[in-house]
From Swiss-Prot:
Notes on activation and inhibition: Activated by Pb(2+) and Hg(2+) ions. Phosphorylation at Thr-161 by PKC/PKCD increases its phospholipid scramblase activity during both cell stimulation and apoptosis.
Organism listed in the record: Homo sapiens (Human)
Tissue-specific expression: Expressed in platelets, erythrocyte membranes, lymphocytes, spleen, thymus, prostate, testis, uterus, intestine, colon, heart, placenta, lung, liver, kidney and pancreas. Not detected in brain and skeletal muscle.
Any GO BP: phosphatidylserine exposure on apoptotic cell surface
pH profile of the protein: Optimum pH is 8.0-9.0 for nuclease activity.
Keywords linked to the UniProt accession: Antiviral defense, Calcium, Cell membrane, Cytoplasm, DNA-binding, Host cell receptor for virus entry, Host-virus interaction, Hydrolase, Lipid transport, Lipoprotein, Magnesium, Membrane, Nuclease, Nucleus, Palmitate, Phosphoprotein, Receptor, Repeat, SH3-binding, Transmembrane, Transmembrane helix, Transport
Transmembrane segment boundaries: 289-305
Protein name: Phospholipid scramblase 1
Induction: (Microbial infection) Induced by IFNB1/IFN-beta in response to a viral infection. Up-regulated during PMA-induced differentiation of the monocytic cell line THP-1.
Biased composition (Polar residues): 1-14
PTM comment: Phosphorylation at Thr-161 by PKC/PKCD increases its phospholipid scramblase activity during both cell stimulation and apoptosis. Phosphorylated by OXSR1 in the presence of RELT. Palmitoylation is required for its phospholipid scramblase activity. Palmitoylation regulates its localization to the cell membrane or the nucleus; trafficking to the cell membrane is dependent upon palmitoylation whereas in the absence of palmitoylation, localizes to the nucleus.
């Protein structure tokens, strides 16, 4: 054995390589023939195989037809502000088109965009909102569709159509609010909003319930059957804190979620009506009812937080 090793070393004394082995690899790289089982992977000085290498490379290097990891799984479209869209999940059974996103989330964040023209001139423009999940991914984009005269003459009590689109630009939810009385002292013509998904197909309603002290609402399904209740605080003031509207069972004994108006800072609260909201609901809640909760949030926004400055609805007592 010693004699054989000495013969092998004599062939390439400067590299200590076996007889017949090409000496193109550096001395420190020799760990045995490439691909030979029982030898460790490549060392620091071992050069990687060239691009398109088809043979069995050293251990630790990817082989052909093997997936490359740490790459994005979804080709997500990116919005104007660089916000990624939420990947579309597998639609559950009997799910209206476009509502499959709601099947996998239990929290929604709604951010109203600041309109510079409205801030500088007080001229009321169409409201626009970003609807995101808890990871900051955009789920929907919502835009109000009303004429100039209606917005500036009727103010927060105005009727409106609010269209909610998905990442493909398809309108998946439509909110219809008729013109109603905004005073709690007049119980004959209270606020309501209709939620449609897809557009033209009602899936639920949010109906204001008269109460002398508290803002209350009833959530109804497409058959006008009561499903849930919403109860807000007596003082709908957002000064330095959030305002919570609790989502309750029909007997109002169990709280199942909430709609929160988030405090956005003294300057934004004082000079704009661009508000931030959060909606929390059970993960297993029907996607139609989750969409109805979005409609309830927009109705609450227009009723209590659309006015600016020290106007009554912004910091009043219900």
């Amino acid at each position: 054995m010693d004699k054989q090793n000495s013969q092998m070393n004599a062939s390439h004394p400067e590299t200590n390589l076996p007889v017949g082995y090409p000496p193109q690899y550096p001395p420190t790289a020799f760990q045995g023939p490439p691909g030979y089982s029982g030898y460790p992977g490549p060392q620091v000085s071992y050069p990687p195989p060239p691009a398109g290498h088809s043979g069995p490379g050293p251990a630790g290097f990817p082989v052909p037809n093997q997936p490359v990891y740490n790459q994005p799984v979804y080709n997500q479209p990116v919005g104007a502000a660089g916000v990624p869209w939420m990947p579309a999940p597998q639609p559950p059974l009997n799910c209206p088109p476009g509502l499959e996103y709601l099947s996998q989330i239990d929290q929604i964040l709604i951010h109203q965009q600041i309109e510079l023209l409205e801030v500088l001139t007080g001229f009321e423009t169409n409201n626009k909102y970003e609807i995101k999940n808890s990871f900051g991914q955009r789920v929907y984009f919502a835009a109000e569709d009303t004429d100039c005269c209606t917005r500036n003459c009727c103010g927060p009590s105005r009727p409106f159509t609010l269209r909610i689109i998905d990442n493909m630009g398809q309108e998946v939810i439509t909110l219809e609010r008729p013109l109603r009385c905004s005073s709690c002292c007049c119980p004959c013509c209270l606020q309501e909003i209709e939620i449609q998904a897809p557009p033209g197909v009602p899936i639920g309603y949010v109906i204001q319930t008269w109460h002398p002290c508290l803002p209350k609402f009833t959530i109804q399904n497409e058959k006008r059957e009561d499903v849930l209740k919403i109860s807000g605080p007596c003082v709908v003031c957002s000064c330095c804190g959030d305002v919570d509207f609790e989502i309750k069972s029909l007997d109002e004994q169990c709280v199942v979620g909430k709609i929160s108006k988030h405090w956005t800072g003294i300057l934004r609260e004082a000079f704009t009506d661009a508000d931030n909201f959060g909606i929390q609901f059970p993960l297993d809640l029907d996607v139609k009812m989750k969409a109805v909760m979005i409609g309830a949030c927009f109705l609450i926004d227009f009723m209590f937080f659309e006015s600016t400055g020290s106007q009554e609805q912004k910091s009043g007592v219900w």
